From Swiss-Prot:
Ranges of biased composition (kind: Basic and acidic residues): 100-109
Compositional bias segments (type: Pro residues): 9-30
Single GO biological process annotation from the record: brassinosteroid mediated signaling pathway
GO molecular function terms noted in the UniProt entry: kinase inhibitor activity
Name of the gene encoding the protein in the UniProt record: BKI1
Domain of life: Eukaryota
Protein name, as recorded: Probable BRI1 kinase inhibitor 1
Region (Disordered): 1-144, 167-242
């Protein structure tokens, strides 16, 4: 005859599945000691005696439903740790941001305090640079003006020299010609164009100062050379009875000779 051992009732499932498996094994089921020690005729009443009353079972189920599983407890703990760390990080971040803001304010205050000094230095430096540039520009303008003035002076000097040289060439040639004409001998010879030119020039320059000789002296070959002009000419004749007629005839002959020479020159 086999003994029918009472099966323990299975525990109700937890309300929430565990997030992770617990490392500790579950407790063994509660078995009454009366099952092993009770006689065979009392076995039919053993499972009634060993099972707790319904009120106790309901209370145990309520307690189990109230107590969260181990996985939920672990997740709650990890969430609490994460939230605490996040709060701590936020606090540190806010403190660091506040400290950085304070440092920025201090730096701005220092820069504002030192900005007038540096701005004054910068303004003086810029003004010095502008003055140097102005001085350099004025010096360049002066040098350019001097260069232009020197160039104009050189050009004018060269032009004046050129004009003087041209005038001197023309004037020198004329002067030389005049000197040569003055130095040429004058004669009463009625032969050749050179004699006519010389006589014309002589009558132009020495008008009113020429003393002509009588016809006998004018025709003689001895007096055909150079005549001295400027003083009274003494004419020696064979006879001392020279009359006004002879002088008049000589003057008329000289005038006719001059007219002929002028017409030939034209």
């Amino acid at each position: 005859m086999t003994m029918n051992t009472p099966r323990p009732r299975s525990q109700p499932p937890p309300p929430h599945p565990p997030l992770f498996k617990p490392t500790t094994p579950p407790p063994p089921p509660l078995l009454s000691t009366s099952t092993s020690t009770s006689p065979p005729h009392d076995f039919s009443f053993a499972h009634y005696l060993s099972s707790p009353p319904p009120s106790v079972q309901r209370r145990g189920r309520a307690d189990m439903s109230r107590t969260p599983p181990l996985g939920r407890v672990g997740s709650d703990l990890s969430h609490n740790n994460y939230s605490s760390k996040a709060n701590q990080h936020r606090q540190t971040g806010s403190s660091s941001s506040s400290s950085s803001k304070e440092k920025d304010r201090e730096y701005k205050a220092k820069s504002k305090a030192s900005s007038p000094f540096f701005s004054g230095l910068g303004g003086s430096w810029r003004s010095g640079l502008s003055r140097d540039e102005e001085v350099k520009r004025k010096a360049k303008a002066k040098t350019r003006g001097l260069d232009v003035g020197q160039w104009v002076k050189k050009y004018m000097a060269s032009m004046v020299e050129h004009l003087l040289a041209s005038f001197s060439r023309h004037g020198g040639g004329e002067r030389e010609k005049r000197e040569q004409q003055r130095r040429r001998p004058h004669s009463f010879s009625a032969h050749g164009p050179s004699a006519l030119r010389e006589q014309r020039e002589r009558w132009r320059r020495r008008r009113g100062q020429l003393s002509s000789a009588p016809a006998s002296l004018r025709a003689s070959p001895v007096n055909s050379g150079h005549l001295s002009v400027g003083g009274s000419v003494k004419v020696s004749t064979s006879s001392e009875e020279s009359t006004m007629e002879e002088l008049q005839s000589a003057i008329e002959a000289a005038i006719a000779h001059c007219k002929n020479s002028i017409t030939v020159a034209k």
